[in-house]
């Protein structure tokens, strides 16, 4: 689920010839630094769990072991950390939020009265968007940084891995490309699947 938030700090401001320690830009930057060091918890759904289980069969060595490990009831922390260091796998393992824009101040010689940053999140299907907002607030650890959704989210549950459909895909794949493994994957980008699922079409 695609969801963006404005993070904003307001301040009385002033003139740069009389600087103060309480600076909207500094406060926002410190909050963003804390957010950058925060990871949402590991959360696999049916699709991502199957993805890592089947990808493990194609990988070798430590990568194969790590992919198997993250699908276990008690995932190995080292395996989670190693996969999380790879952006394409990290985005499959958890909800992600990242700062993408910053705006502040109005003049070279004026202390900023506002500083704000756009944070874009990719919320795992089935996870509460409001819960993600509350998690961001806790990660920022500063009640002077407001967190406001840019627009209402369009939540969606994950697409089910329908065994009947999957078997048909595997059968045809086997006929045309013998030995090819079918691996379901969850896109971290937006797709029309969101609207189809909400219309009752899996």
Predicted regions and their residues:
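C-terminal catalytic subdomain
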Residues: 110-132
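A generic structural motif
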Residues: 11-17, 106, 121-128
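Predominant activation on well-ordered alpha-helical scaffold segments within soluble catalytic domains
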Residues: 6, 26-33, 96, 170
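Short amphipathic alpha-helices in soluble, non-transmembrane regions
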Residues: 22, 31, 132-140
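A common structural junction motif
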Residues: 35-39, 137-145
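An extended, acidic, His-containing surface patch that forms the Zn2+-binding/catalytic region
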Residues: 46-106, 113, 130-134, 146-202
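A short core secondary-structure module
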Residues: 12, 16-42
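Hydrophobic, small-residue-rich alpha-helical packing segments that form membrane-like cores
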Residues: 1-3
């Amino acid at each position: 689920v695609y969801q963006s938030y404005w993070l904003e700090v307001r301040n009385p401001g002033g003139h740069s010839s009389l600087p103060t320690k309480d600076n909207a830009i500094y406060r926002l930057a410190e909050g963003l630094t804390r957010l950058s060091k925060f990871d949402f918890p590991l959360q696999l759904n049916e699709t991502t769990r199957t993805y890592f289980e089947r990808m493990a069969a194609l990988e070798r060595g430590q990568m194969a072991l790590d992919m198997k490990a993250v699908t276990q009831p008690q995932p190995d922390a080292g395996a989670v950390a190693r996969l999380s260091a790879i952006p394409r796998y990290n985005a499959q393992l958890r909800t992600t939020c990242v700062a993408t824009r910053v705006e502040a101040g109005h003049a070279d010689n004026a202390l900023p009265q506002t500083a704000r940053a756009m944070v874009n999140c990719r919320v795992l299907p089935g996870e509460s968007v409001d819960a993600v907002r509350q998690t961001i607030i806790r990660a920022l650890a500063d009640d002077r940084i407001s967190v406001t959704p840019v627009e209402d989210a369009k939540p969606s549950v994950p697409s089910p891995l329908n065994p009947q459909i999957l078997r048909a895909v595997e059968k045809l794949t086997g006929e045309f490309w013998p030995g090819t493994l079918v691996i379901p994957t969850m896109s971290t980008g937006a797709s029309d699947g969101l609207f189809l699922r909400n219309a009752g079409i899996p």
